[in-house]
């Protein structure tokens, strides 16, 4: 029996852990600290699926009817 992956479900947007260079650019652009971003618990099923650890920032790429793609950033907490 194969394991179900959350990332394969059509209603779950794409999630990826950001690298430090891209993160620095985003934080500078929005003039925020990583701790000011919306939170994502490390125990959240999607965080477990992608292997996120406390302190990581996850970029969520959502499909949007008006914008095509909408980017969203979440700070992983313990």
UniProtKB/Swiss-Prot annotation:
Quaternary structure and interacting proteins, as annotated: Part of the RNA polymerase complex.
Top class in the EC scheme: transferase
Keyword terms: Cytoplasm, DNA-directed RNA polymerase, Nucleotidyltransferase, Transcription, Transferase
Function per UniProt: DNA-dependent RNA polymerase (RNAP) catalyzes the transcription of DNA into RNA using the four ribonucleoside triphosphates as substrates.
Entry keyword Nucleotidyltransferase: yes
GO MF entry, a single one: DNA-directed RNA polymerase activity
Cellular location(s): Cytoplasm
A biological process term (GO) from this entry: transcription by RNA polymerase II
The EC number(s) this enzyme carries: 2.7.7.6
Species name: Methanococcoides burtonii (strain DSM 6242 / NBRC 107633 / OCM 468 / ACE-M)
Similarity comment: Belongs to the archaeal Rpo5/eukaryotic RPB5 RNA polymerase subunit family.
Keyword Cytoplasm: yes
Principal subcellular localization: cytoplasm
GO cellular component, as recorded: cytoplasm; DNA-directed RNA polymerase complex
Name of the featured protein: DNA-directed RNA polymerase subunit Rpo5
InterPro entries in alphabetical order: Arch_Rpo5/euc_Rpb5 (IPR014381), RNA_pol_subH/Rpb5_C (IPR000783), RPB5-like_sf (IPR035913)
Taxonomic classification: Archaea, Methanobacteriati, Methanobacteriota, Stenosarchaea group, Methanomicrobia
Catalyzed reaction equations: RNA(n) + a ribonucleoside 5'-triphosphate = RNA(n+1) + diphosphate
């Amino acid at each position: 029996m194969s394991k179900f992956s959350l990332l394969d479900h059509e209603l779950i947007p794409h999630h990826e852990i950001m690298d430090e260079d891209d993160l620095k650019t985003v934080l500078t652009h929005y003039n925020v600290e990583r701790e000011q971003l919306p939170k994502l618990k490390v125990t959240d099923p999607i965080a477990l699926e992608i292997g996120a650890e406390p302190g990581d920032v996850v970029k969520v790429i959502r499909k949007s009817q008006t914008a095509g793609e909408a980017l969203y950033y979440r700070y992983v907490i313990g």
